[in-house]
Swiss-Prot record:
This is Beta-glucosidase 31. GO terms for biological process: carbohydrate metabolic process; response to other organism. It catalyses: Hydrolysis of terminal, non-reducing beta-D-glucosyl residues with release of beta-D-glucose. SUPFAM superfamilies: (Trans)glycosidases (SSF51445). It holds the Pfam family Glyco_hydro_1. The keyword Hydrolase applies. Its EC number is 3.2.1.21. Disulfide bonds join 219-227.
Length: 534
């Protein structure tokens, strides 16, 4: 033991001297920390109900579309489901302690509609046990000095509403969502000041109704043979149209709710990629970038800022795109206090001349192809996750923020998700996953670009949330993909183990004004690995 203590002292002294002399600083001689960002900038971790809670048949909860999807089509979610998930329903108190230990300010979580209103309709009655669970969760967060940041809907609509009228395919969803949101504001609004209505309407509409790889799992049969019904050319547009109207209806309720304080805010969470032209010398590919941004961001943000869809989408989709009435346009326009941005990665895009217009679908309406490499064969980044889907492109975060600032009147933004995953294919040990240097570098580089966007470019960004606190159920990837700052041992009672990234964030967010520089952090990490072999 004495040898270990001596080793620690020597290592820390050497590391501190190296850092003081500016040696081997691979990131920066003046590393970022909490104080590199504006006062009251919000740092937090994010989650969602279906991915975390489990307890799907406990406490009066009814089944959601994801319960049905994972059990009806297990092969489409890696044979996994959220029945237990990471058991947050029973373990939220211990998980809140993990958030506090990392010096995080906020916790973003979603409410399970089917846990609060089992039938989906307020008129059919409230599940008091479900309401009490969220009240207990909110109280526990506040008692630990953590701000609750609530999402009303994160993809898990009660199955009952889909059975009755097709959920977001029907305009009937607007009033049911309005009533659900109003109830949430009344019940939780006195203690929750930050709200979002919907998480990632683009992903919900496209993955659920164009590609069919997420619940609802609908698409044209020729797009995906696993889809049993759907129309990829019309349903994504219809779903998002009703979703935007439901969002606006909820915001109306928010702004007249007597339980909501004057400093409370509400928004919606979008999920933009950044795009670069496949051929930087091609005007057609540069125009494809603009179309990609219009479909990826403008589809939902343009109605919120300007009251209507982008002209590009109107032209491409024609009469398959629903239109707003004058009253609806006025209701949707300016129905936000801030915009949530979930940014992960970027793609190259090329103009596509070979679209089959006899088989319309949302993705081909864009007349472009997504590419992982450019014309010369270069990837957009040298760093990717194990699936080769998520490529780290920090510059894209700064670019997307400036694009939104310049095109959409510089709205207030929160980075509501940003994260990097490990792919567990059975060949990687727990120790290797815990030593998540790639994740640390991913977050540091994105935070550097975010800080530039704020201080140099004038982007109005107020917060940054990592995805995610814990490894969890990652939709069609099941539990094979791990985004957590904490490792969840699915084979041993769901034990939580801090990854190195959790320790890095703890020091990044220290309020002492003396954060751990990256090289000192790496020296300590090397020391710890050495001690394991003594």
């Amino acid at each position: 033991m004495a040898i270990k203590l001596i080793a620690l002292v020597i290592t820390l002294c050497v590391a501190s001297w190296d850092v003081a002399q500016g040696r081997s600083l691979r990131f920066s001689t003046t590393p970022l920390n909490r104080y590199s960002f504006p006062p009251h900038f919000d740092f937090g971790v994010a989650s969602s109900a279906y991915q975390y809670e489990g307890a799907v048949e406990e406490g009066g909860r009814s089944l959601s579309i994801w319960d049905n999807f994972t059990h009806a089509f297990p092969e489409r979610t890696n044979m996994d489901n959220g029945d237990v998930a990471v058991d947050f329903y029973h373990r939220y108190k211990e998980d809140i302690k993990l958030i506090k230990e990392m010096n995080m300010d906020s916790f973003r979580f979603s409410l399970s509609w089917s846990r609060i209103l089992p039938s989906g309709k307020l008129s059919d009655g409230v599940n008091k046990e479900g309401v009490q669970f969220y009240k207990n969760l909110i109280d526990e967060l506040i008692e630990n000095g953590i701000k609750p940041f609530v999402t009303i809907y994160h993809w898990d609509i009660p199955q009952a509403l889909d059975d009755e009228y097709g959920s977001f395919l029907s305009p009937r969803i607007i009033d049911d969502f309005r009533n659900y949101a109003r109830f949430c504001f009344q019940e939780f609004g006195d203690k929750v000041s930050m709200w979002t209505t919907f998480n990632e309407p683009y992903v919900y509409s496209v993955s659920g109704y164009d590609a069919g790889n997420k619940a609802m799992g609908r698409c044209s049969k020729w797009v995906n043979s696993l889809c049993i019904a759907g129309d990829s050319g019309t349903e994504p547009y219809l779903v998002s149209h009703h979703l935007l109207l439901a969002h606006a209806a909820a915001v109306e309720e928010f702004r007249k709710c007597d339980k909501i304080s004057q400093d409370s805010k509400i928004g919606i969470v979008l999920s933009p990629y950044w795009f670069e032209p496949y051929d930087s010398a091609s005007n057609a590919d540069k125009e494809a970038v603009e179309r990609a941004l219009a479909f990826n961001i403008g589809w939902h943000l343009s109605p919120l800022v300007f009251g209507d869809y982008p002209e590009t989408i109107k032209i491409s989709a024609g009469n398959r795109l629903p239109s707003f009435t004058k009253e609806q346009s006025m209701m949707v326009k300016n129905s936000f206090d801030f915009i949530g941005v979930n940014y992960y990665t970027a793609r190259f895009v090329a103009h596509d001349l070979n679209v089959d217009i006899s088989r319309p679908r949302f993705m081909t309406d864009q007349h472009l192809q997504y590419k992982l490499t450019n014309r010369t064969g270069d990837t957009i980044s040298l760093e990717s996750d194990g699936t080769k889907i998520l490529w780290s492109y920090p510059e894209g975060l700064r670019k997307i923020l400036n694009y939104i600032k310049n095109k959409y009147n510089n709205p207030t933004i929160y980075i509501t998700e940003n994260g990097f995953d490990d792919y567990e294919n059975g060949t990687v040990t727990r120790e290797e996953i815990l030593e998540d240097t790639k994740r640390i570098e991913y977050h540091q580089k994105h935070l550097q670009e975010l800080q530039k966007a704020i201080t140099e470019d004038g982007c109005d960004v107020k917060g940054y949330f990592t995805w995610s606190l814990l490894d969890n159920f990652e939709w069609e990837h099941g539990y094979a993909v791990r985004f957590g700052l904490y490792y969840v041992d699915y084979k041993n009672g769901l034990q939580r183990h801090a990854k190195h990234s959790a320790m890095w964030f703890k020091h990044f967010l220290e309020r002492s004004g003396k954060p751990m520089p990256m090289d000192l952090f790496k020296s300590v990490k090397r020391w710890w690995s050495t001690l394991q072999m003594i």
